[in-house]
Amino acid sequence: MSIILGIDPGSRITGYGVIRQVGRQLTYLGSGCIRTKVDDLPSRLKLIYAGVTEIITQFQPDYFAIEQVFMAKNADSALKLGQARGVAIVAAVNQELPVFEYAARQVKQTVVGIGSAEKSQVQHMVRTLLKLPANPQADAADALAIAITHCHVSQNAMQMSESRLNLARGRLR
């Protein structure tokens, strides 16, 4: 059993999603947004750090998964996003959590089956996969999708390792 915290970073709204994985079974534990309503960036970063730390304390995850930085058209926005990611990662590292990063395209490909999927498609698939009563808020859905991606990637990696081990032992399944 593993608990995975997914983070969709943003300097104004940071989405989070927490799921439990037991084998192939995924269970929704919680999700939401850390909203930073203050204007100055250092205060927003402090709120993100405190919010992520509080979520880690509440849910005690085993793994921390976060969206990678993408190339933005606006350099200022990209820098702020990078700083928001940084404080979220520091919160995880301070709690000694292993950190995994996934590209947005990989997350969409894993959850929806199309790397260029729209936000509404991600919300719908997250709702379906986790058997939620309604679509989660967009940032929370993205964070849950990141956590789901981590589950699939880590499970596939374990299966490949087992296959390699069996091959090395002369057994093919």
From Swiss-Prot:
Cofactor(s) required, per the database record: Mg(2+)
Active site residues of this protein: 8, 67, 139
Cellular localization per UniProt: Cytoplasm
EC number assigned by the record: 3.1.21.10
Gene Ontology CC: cytoplasm; Holliday junction resolvase complex
Catalysed reactions listed for this entry: Endonucleolytic cleavage at a junction such as a reciprocal single-stranded crossover between two homologous DNA duplexes (Holliday junction)
InterPro entries assigned: RNaseH-like_sf, RNaseH_sf, X-over_junc_endoDNase_Mg_BS, X-over_junc_endoDNase_RuvC
Gene3D superfamilies: Ribonuclease H-like superfamily/Ribonuclease H (3.30.420.10)
A GO BP entry: DNA repair
GO terms assigned for molecular function: crossover junction DNA endonuclease activity; DNA binding; magnesium ion binding
Binding, Mg(2+) 1: 8, 139
Cofactor note: Binds 2 Mg(2+) ion per subunit.
Binding site for Mg(2+) 2: 67
Its biological purpose: The RuvA-RuvB-RuvC complex processes Holliday junction (HJ) DNA during genetic recombination and DNA repair. Endonuclease that resolves HJ intermediates. Cleaves cruciform DNA by making single-stranded nicks across the HJ at symmetrical positions within the homologous arms, yielding a 5'-phosphate and a 3'-hydroxyl group; requires a central core of homology in the junction. The consensus cleavage sequence is 5'-(A/T)TT(C/G)-3'. Cleavage occurs on the 3'-side of the TT dinucleotide at the point of strand exchange.
Family: Belongs to the RuvC family.
Full protein name: Crossover junction endodeoxyribonuclease RuvC
Lineage: Bacteria, Pseudomonadati, Pseudomonadota, Gammaproteobacteria, Enterobacterales
